[in-house]
């Protein structure tokens, strides 16, 4: 009989899975992106996408989606298939770093708060590596931010991420004024116990 500890988080591509599935240099680079906001190299993104796809397929996933929270108050998803036809009549499973990092849904059906004209319908979903991907049913759900072509926030997550970046920047400035030069990043957290995590 399976215990709760056996299946708790088993469908989440969390730190334990990343550490097990990714080469050490890829894992270290991704952790630097997550913890310090460092830019993500295209080769690292491809390696992460391959590991994420293989893990998802092992758990029965056939599709992936960029999962985001537009201004409608509910979540939205754009589903794509891992499956591509092969020349010999079979199928191959594909998922690239480019597909992981960015999607381009039609933004015309989502509210914009008057930020742009209706004909400026292009919107982008951008992978948020600070939130773990997870499997729901047969779909790998990739948490993303949703922005307009010119960078305006079209969702509820982008303002939160930008606020966290601003808080990190100012908190680091204050800490360095007090002589603490070792802190690289400040992570605000909200929960039963509110605290701020410092990355040294």
Functional labels for PLM-detected ranges:
Residues 1-5, 193:
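Divalent-metal coordination cores built from histidine and acidic residues
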Residues 4, 8-11, 16-97, 102-117:
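Histidine/acidic residue-rich metal-binding segments in metalloenzymes
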Residues 46, 58, 161, 165-169, ...:
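Conserved structured core elements
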Residues 115-182:
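Charge-rich interaction surfaces and accessory domains that mediate macromolecular binding and assembly
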Residues 41-43, 179-189:
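Flexible, glycine/charged-enriched surface loops at secondary-structure junctions
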Residues 36-38, 90-91, 125, 138-144, ...:
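Structural beta-strand/beta-sheet cores of well-ordered domains, especially the beta-sheet scaffolds
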Residues 196-199:
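Conserved small/polar residues in nucleotide/adenosyl-binding loops
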Residues 64, 192-193:
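Buried hydrophobic positions in well-ordered alpha/beta secondary-structure cores of metabolic enzymes
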